[in-house]
Amino acid sequence: MFGAEVDVDLRAPVDGETIAAVRAALNEHEVLVVRDQDLSGDDMLALGHAFGELLCNPFSPSADDAPELIIFDNHDENPAALTDVWHADETFRAEPPSVTMLHSLIAPSLGGGTMFASMRAAYELLSERMKAFIEGLTALHDFGRFDGLFPNEPDARARLHQIELAHPHPVHPVVRVHPETGRQVLYVNRHFTRRINELPEDEGAALLEFLLTRPSMPEIQLRVDWRAETLVMWDNRSVQHYACHDYYPQRRRMQRVTVAGDRPVADTPPPPRSVQRVVVPNPPEQPEAASVPRRRVLRPFERTGGEVPVS
């Protein structure tokens, strides 16, 4: 079943048995929703580190003292940018993220939900002939859509060039194999996939556009409606998401960490391990989150002094 709501307390410290159970549930359900999680920034960092190394996103606003902790604080005076598109996170990397964790600090009373689509299901719903046709194809990925975040001035363009050098347009399989479950996944997205390498430009563009529409099928979707202190974790290797920009002028403040992954491959790994359903206790009731003042959070490249983190 795609998506699950689970009861577990993920405030630090979290023991290894709980982490293993959550990881198993994530492999099975792809998206996990955990309500009533009073998580500080340090809690988010600790939880992310329990799953692996954390990445810094050079295009997203982050905490001043922790570039791995992304802060989204959006409202009518600071609308979100480039998130209302179906995408997987950061496939412009040679080794894209494995898991994304997003936690709500302030949630709108209406709207502001996040849509998710299972690209495992998207692949499975293709015809056998289409599966055979796209087998072995590869695609170029880059972050060209984000160039507009950088003003046309020397310092900003120099920072952009620094990021380009760190992430030189990787090639990923159109169909990747999940390294833990062994399931095949359709692995192209509208944010970062530019072209299919093995086809003429016109044929590749037509095929790519068809594949890019697959997340729009309601049969493979779910929607999470946020309320304060909700944590959502998803498998970035097999899930795409879309942030709904339908809540202005209300405010939506979120914190996010992104766990490093491995290089996507098309070869089938050994048979997957069995997955156990998670049974965890209900968390204790948490106090209401304190109000947070409005202050635009800076992206790494907007800060002065020091290099842009590009890990």
Regions found by a protein language model. Name each.
Residues 1-231, 236-311:
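Non-heme Fe(II) oxygenase catalytic core, chiefly the N-lobe of the double-stranded beta-helix
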